[in-house]
Amino acid sequence: MKYSNKESHITPRFERRFFGGDNFLTLNIESSNDVLRWIDWTTARLPFRICTVRILKAIKDIMALFRGNFPGYFACDTRYHDLAHTLRLFPPFCQIAIALFRKHPATILSMELELGLLTILLHDSGYIRKEGDCNGTGAKYTFHHIDRSVDFARTYLPSLGYQEQDLLNVEHMIRCTGIKPKLKQINFTSEGYRLLGYALGTADLLSQMSDPHYLRKLSLLFSELEEAYSYAGPNQLGKMEVQRFKSYRDLIQHTPFFFKKVAGKCLQNMGAVYRLLENPETGLNPYLKRVQENMKGITQRSIPHNCYRYPLGQANRRVILTPNSMAGGFHHVL
């Protein structure tokens, strides 16, 4: 694989957008160097350093994987679970992880945080098809993508020098993601990995449901589910007890119930670490606030008629990485 050593000249800029008008740092996700600089800036106040060499290599490799430049794999062809979807986990995960460290400084260690960051990059790699898999898209693996992500992580991470124990810890954290993670079946090797696994699962839910374009993107999610339904077949769906939505409008109408009964329960079961995202001065959780606004848009039927078609273009190459207004979360002990 050929990677450009040219340093990105894209300058991060603050823009007023979403989350009640709070400021967010917006970075171009086309640049692995920009993403690494953001991680380095975020974790700079911790008393230890992570291995940025391996993190940068992983960022470049996963970007190559999603773009079809990784040996043995096709490009990502799932329009909902894309590269931007993966990178959106960094802000809430990092804020929760740093808050956890400030509460339990002896629990969150350098290697644990490093593997947590790597797990973000790897957690949806199971959607990527291998070369020779020419039927359909990666969406067909929706109900099996976690196992496939674990398999990819176990194959890939040794190339960065990680050992079997590291692979096991990454597997445990990957299994904290998804709609209904079986948390009680995960034998975490340390309290730190358990907490970071919960941080990852929490970030996975909140980062997508708080997306300002979430309601529009549900049509893309339904397209993925539709292919997954067909690939699994009715018998397998029955065994998995998977709810089948009749249309994307049906999916949208069930979303408030999903957030309240399924996602809400999941967030509580993961140690309620979502509370660490609250602003210490106002008590406002900007992620939950945006999720609630999205749910309100559904229940009040204030969704524009044409919102179901999500436009692809320049906006998809940018991702909101961190809110300036939440920087206080990096300084205080919650």
Indicate where each model-derived feature is located.
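Structured all-alpha helical bundle cores of eukaryotic regulatory proteins
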Residues: 130-153
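Divalent metal-dependent phosphate-bond-processing catalytic cores, especially two-metal-ion Mg2+/Mn2+ enzymes
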Residues: 2-48, 95-112, 122, 179-334
